[in-house]
Design a protein with these regions (language model features):
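Sec-dependent signal peptide recognition
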Residues: 1-2
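C-terminal motif of bacterial Sec signal peptides marking the signal peptidase cleavage site
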Residues: 5-8
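Bacterial lipoprotein signal-peptidase II cleavage site
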Residues: 10-16
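Active-site-adjacent structural elements in enzyme catalytic domains
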Residues: 17-154, 159-437
């Protein structure tokens, strides 16, 4: 089924909405813990694609990359007022202010540009409350719902007894922002290459990106893996994570998706690359398998169990007949600062690497049926490894006008209702050429 994605870098009080569970056929009985469950089934990624996945290890490519590159952008931090920040300086309108001016019939009151918005972060600089009262509908909604409104709204939002405190930004963490919206927009939409002027208002490239990211604040997506919601991840005596939502994405699932989507299809997908409570969504760009070696069952046990003499056979998947040890380097796209130029020509400057180490579990025919992460669990000659990603997801597009239950049964929009995807899409189309009217 489809998940409605609002994941982060985001306020952790807002939960993922999904009609999927890890239980089969509505049963309350979980799958065996030693196999990937429905939440980790790679087939979830191809339900809406005319494609079939390959599972035989020998048929899977050792390297691959996305043919359509995801573009870097700011994650528009909450503490900076999200996409209402005046990123070019206080004498230039924010992306939301520009949109209101062109599309929402907003007219700035006299002296508006002399009003000072609140600065980002913990600042003692003065600001003008009248600025926020004068905002147009898109900018005001963004500031109040995705920005730093709680730092100057006269309320004790983090319930610590202090109103509008500077320290801690009234409970706003620095990682909160729109990377959950940037990631699908960057994967699915073409990067704007030129500024676009409408009715005398010029939308710079990062203005355009901010608008498109705003429309992807809630996305349609297929998700693999559960959300880990704790910073205190407990492990057993062998270093294996106990909580299934923190242990997945299953290593076998990860390898199947990585090699099929990037290796065979050239399609980017998204990951939460940190398995703790923080959510850092990133587009996955490419991979290369550094080491792939079929190993014996006893070798697999030795890699996974501190005292191999305590087990008589492989303990994590009773159907596994063959095993492989894998080391893979994965490149992902990172955020950028807002800028007035495209990044298409220096895309590699915004790639970072993770190295993963895992065991693949296979049936007798060599088809992958599961896996176990080794990252940090064993002393290895392969060097340093990253911890496994939390979940993977395949974006399908922005969700139109999602609503949530508000106070007294009211229906509240979950993303900015004053920004139109079709209007922003038209701006993006114009931004592909300097000559389009």
């Amino acid at each position: 089924m489809m998940a409605l994605l609002w994941l982060g870098c985001s306020d952790p009080m807002v939960e993922t909405m999904t009609d999927e569970t890890a239980e089969p056929n509505g049963s309350s009985a979980p799958f065996k813990a030693d196999e990937w469950d429905r939440l980790n089934d790679p087939e979830r990624f191809v339900r809406y694609l005319d494609q079939e996945l390959l599972y035989t290890l020998s048929e899977l490519p050792l390297e691959g990359e996305a043919t359509k590159k995801a573009w870097p952008a700011s994650y528009w931090p909450t503490y900076e007022d999200s996409t209402n920040v005046r990123w070019l300086g206080n004498d230039t309108l924010s992306p939301m202010e520009k949109y209101d001016l062109v599309y929402n019939g907003w007219t700035p009151p006299e002296g508006f540009m002399d009003l000072q918005p609140r600065g980002g972060g913990c600042t003692t600089a003065t600001f003008d409350p009248e600025y926020y009262e004068a905002l147009g509908p898109a900018a005001r909604w963004m500031s109040e719902n995705r920005g730093h409104w709680r730092t100057h709204d006269g309320l004790d939002n983090d319930a610590d007894g202090t109103i509008d405190e500077c320290a801690g930004n009234e409970g706003i963490d620095g990682w909160w922002g729109l990377c959950h919206a940037w990631t699908p927009a960057a994967i699915l939409e073409d990067e704007p290459l030129y500024p676009v002027t409408v009715d005398g208002v010029t939308f710079e490239i990062s203005d355009l990106k901010a608008l498109m990211i705003t429309t992807y604040d809630y996305s349609r997506a297929m998700v693999v893996g559960g959300r880990c919601k704790t910073d205190r991840v407990e492990r057993d005596e062998n270093g294996r994570i106990l909580n299934p939502d923190c242990r997945d994405t299953n290593a076998g699932t990860f390898h199947v998706i990585l090699t099929n989507f990037l290796g065979r299809l050239g399609m980017a997908f998204a990951e939460d690359r940190t398995y703790d409570a923080q959510v850092w969504n990133q587009p996955v760009d490419s991979y290369i398998v550094e080491n792939l070696m079929e190993i014996s069952e006893s070798d697999a046990i030795t890699l996974l169990i501190d005292d191999p003499s305590t087990v008589s056979r492989y303990p994590y998947n009773e159907d596994a007949q063959r095993f492989a040890e894998v080391v893979v380097t994965v490149n992902y796209v990172v955020e950028s600062v807002p800028m007035s130029r495209p990044i298409v020509d220096n895309h590699s400057d915004y790639l970072r690497k993770d190295r993963y180490h895992y065991i693949l579990e296979m049936d007798e025919a060599g088809s992958i049926i599961g896996g176990e992460w080794l990252n940090g669990r064993v002393t290895s000659s392969f060097g340093h490894f990253s911890q496994q990603p939390d979940f993977l997801w395949l974006p399908r597009g922005p969700l139109a006008n999602p609503m949530a239950n508000g106070p007294q049964g009211a229906r509240d929009p979950k993303k900015n209702p004053h920004v139109s995807y079709s209007k922003v899409k038209r701006l993006f189309e114009r931004a592909q050429s300097p000559d389009m009217p």
